[in-house]
């Protein structure tokens, strides 16, 4: 019986992990795409004196978005760890 419960918990953790990996992977990819677009457009803006200050702003915002990448990863890890701890608490309470 205990082996089945562990198997069920492992299955639940895998399902949860896949759900959150997909969700955060989309956020991460969208963020990367926006960063790339900002740096590309900012680079072209540097060819024109009129648009140079807008290009600087795009670089600054793109750099800020680079800081969001590890933040997304930390939030994902925090939520996943929280879920794992809850599963193990649930498992230990049913073992008693």
From Swiss-Prot:
Compartment(s) where it occurs, according to its Swiss-Prot or TrEMBL record: Cell membrane
Question: Sorted alphabetically, which keywords does the UniProt record give?
Answer: Cell membrane, Membrane, Transmembrane, Transmembrane helix
| Chief localisation class | membrane
* Gene Ontology cellular-component terms listed: plasma membrane
**What InterPro entries is this protein classified in?**
YrhK_domain (IPR025424)
Q: Transmembrane stretches, by residue range?
A: 27-47, 52-72
Q: How does it sit in the membrane?
A: Multi-pass membrane protein
Q: What is this protein called?
A: Uncharacterized protein YrhK
Biological source species: Bacillus subtilis (strain 168)
**Gene encoding it?**
yrhK
């Amino acid at each position: 019986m205990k082996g089945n419960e562990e198997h069920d918990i492992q299955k639940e953790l895998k399902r949860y992990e896949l759900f959150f990996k997909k969700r955060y992977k989309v956020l991460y990819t969208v963020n990367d795409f926006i960063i790339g677009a900002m740096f590309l457009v900012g680079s072209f803006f540097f060819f024109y004196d009129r648009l140079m200050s807008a290009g600087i702003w795009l670089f600054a915002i793109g750099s800020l978005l680079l800081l969001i990448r590890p933040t997304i990863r930390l939030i994902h890890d925090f939520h996943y760890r929280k879920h794992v701890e809850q599963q193990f608490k649930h498992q230990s309470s049913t073992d008693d």
